[in-house]
Swiss-Prot record:
Annotated organism of origin: Saccharomyces cerevisiae (strain ATCC 204508 / S288c) (Baker's yeast)
Catalytic activity: a 1,2-diacyl-sn-glycero-3-phospho-(1D-myo-inositol) + UDP-N-acetyl-alpha-D-glucosamine = a 6-(N-acetyl-alpha-D-glucosaminyl)-1-(1,2-diacyl-sn-glycero-3-phospho)-1D-myo-inositol + UDP + H(+)
Pfam families xref list: Glycos_transf_1 (PF00534), PIGA (PF08288)
Residues passing through the membrane, by range: 407-427
Quaternary structure and interacting proteins, as annotated: Component of the phosphatidylinositol N-acetylglucosaminyltransferase (GPI-GlcNAc transferase) complex composed of at least GPI1, GPI2, GPI3, GPI15, GPI19 and ERI1.
Membrane topology: Single-pass membrane protein
Its biological purpose: Catalytic subunit in the complex catalyzing the transfer of N-acetylglucosamine from UDP-N-acetylglucosamine to phosphatidylinositol, the first step of GPI biosynthesis.
Identification of the protein by name: Phosphatidylinositol N-acetylglucosaminyltransferase GPI3 subunit
Pathway: Glycolipid biosynthesis; glycosylphosphatidylinositol-anchor biosynthesis
GO cellular component assignments: cytosol; endoplasmic reticulum; endoplasmic reticulum membrane; glycosylphosphatidylinositol-N-acetylglucosaminyltransferase (GPI-GnT) complex
Coiled coil spans: none
Length: 452
């Protein structure tokens, strides 16, 4: 018997990113395993209401005020009526939220706990402790996860970061990495349709990502001119958009690199593979990274990886696929890039086996099965007392911080008052149940038979 699961996050299609693809691919594989999945996110321009995606995946686009980078305005309580209605209509058993910076994720967990549902949270990011934004997010996460059933982190570094930020027990935190659809990131076939635009005499370095300071954009604008001045046969392809885009334009003009640096701007995800296949090396200068899915995608296209060692990056790929910078600095990244260029130029490393290795290491079906194990565990071992409202309110009061714990307590009490009010105004037995999408479980044997 499958679970009825709701994924909650501010970030989903049509916006593209690592969290969005994680939610989509995980949901698709959960459906293949026989579970029912709906996604609850905010409206994106004309995407309002209910949308049905491949395999019967239902998406609720809730109209809500967006403040910054597709994050909705935090109100704690105002999303309760609509989220409660959806959870009851879809007969949800498990609420799975994603993203520390997502308002829908935080409020969804709070409302689900109040309704007595099982809750899971996946963290995709690393946060520090030395600026106002990080402190605010950490305090909010501490409140949200006080009564969580299980937390999933995408790397061991992310898990350690989560423990320090929220003081949760390590026993309820699991590590499940991201994955990649290796079929979508096949290396270039010289005899096929994807042909390299650059001359084979050139070494092409690819950079793909959001052009933000935390993604190393300031470092890249200083690294690229240095590498170009040292190697006449090196060219760059930079794909992505963000507030640092103009800095890249200025860098190209000031160093007269118009013929050696292509600035593509935002690239649709279905075109990312085509961009990667134009290169020999992938350069990743991120200042913070919990996992780094793009590294797996680049390696799947047989690119040699040059990267920093921040966060969970060292856990992602084997050493033979990567050249690490000793420090997150311009000089060390230039040195690592020069080393990778010499490896490619001398053909000291055969990268043609990278794709097969990555396809064996990362698979979304494996991620889904491990996630289902967590769902099964919290459903079978947890008791009804865990969701007793008096116990959960008491847990909020036990948190550290003389002001914080009183604020948590006040929010918890108001939440339960609102819960009882909604139960009286809109009784759950008067809410129509949504019909389930007809589905058939896809077994591994069936998939193998189809492939053969």
């Amino acid at each position: 018997m499958g679970f009825n699961i709701a994924m909650l996050c501010d970030f989903f299609y049509p916006q593209l990113g690592g969290v969005e693809f994680h939610i989509y691919h995980l949901s698709q594989k959960l459906i293949d395993l026989g579970h029912s999945v709906v996604i609850i996110t905010h409206a994106y321009k004309d995407r309002v209401g209910v949308r049905h995606l491949t395999n019967g995946l239902k998406v609720y686009h809730v109209p809500f005020f967006v403040i910054f980078r597709e994050t909705t305005f935090p109100t704690v309580f105002s999303t309760f009526p609509i989220i409660r209605n959806i959870l009851l209509r879809e007969q949800i058993q498990i609420v799975h939220s994603h993203g520390s910076a997502s308002t829908f994720a935080h409020e969804g967990i709070l409302h689900a706990n109040t309704m007595g549902l099982r809750t899971v949270f996946t963290d995709h990011s690393l946060y520090g402790f030395n600026n106002l934004t990080s402190i605010w997010v950490n305090k909010l996460l501490t409140f949200t996860l006080t009564n969580i059933d299980r937390v999933i982190c995408v790397s061991n570094t992310c898990k350690e970061n989560m423990i320090v930020r929220t003081e949760l027990s390590p026993d309820i935190i699991s590590v499940i990495p991201n994955a990649v659809v290796s079929e979508d990131f096949k290396p270039r076939d010289p005899t096929g349709g994807t042909k390299r635009k650059q001359s084979r005499d050139k070494i092409v370095i690819v950079v793909i990502g959001r052009l933000f300071p935390n993604k190393g954009s300031d470092l890249l604008t200083r690294i690229i001119p240095k590498v170009c001045s040292s190697h006449e046969d090196v060219e760059f392809i930079v794909a992505g958009d963000g507030p640092k885009f103009i800095d890249f334009q200025q860098m190209i003009e000031s160093h007269r690199l118009q013929k050696r640096v292509q600035l593509l701007g935002s690239v649709p995800h279905e075109k990312v593979r085509d961009v990667l296949c134009q290169g020999d090396i992938y350069l990743h200068a991120s200042l913070t990274e919990a996992f780094g899915t793009i590294l797996v995608e680049a390696a799947s296209c047989n690119l040699l990886i040059v990267t920093t060692q921040v966060g969970g990056i060292p856990e992602v790929l084997p050493n033979e696929m990567t050249v690490y910078a000793e420090q997150t600095s311009v000089s060390d990244l230039v040195q690592a890039t020069n080393k990778a260029i010499n490896i490619i130029r001398s053909k000291a490393l055969d990268t043609s086996s990278f794709h097969d290795s990555v396809s064996k290491m990362y698979d979304w079906m494996d991620v889904a099965k491990r996630t289902v194990e967590i769902y099964t565990n919290i459903s079978s071992t947890s008791s009804a007392d865990d969701k007793d409202w008096m116990k959960m309110v008491a847990n909020l009061y036990k948190r550290d911080g003389i002001w914080a714990k009183h604020l948590y307590l006040l929010c918890g009490i108001v939440e339960y008052m609102l819960f009882f009010l909604l139960e009286w105004l809109y009784p759950r037995d008067e809410i129509d149940l949504a019909p389930k999408w007809p589905k058939k479980t896809v077994s591994n044997e069936t998939k193998e038979a189809r492939e053969t």
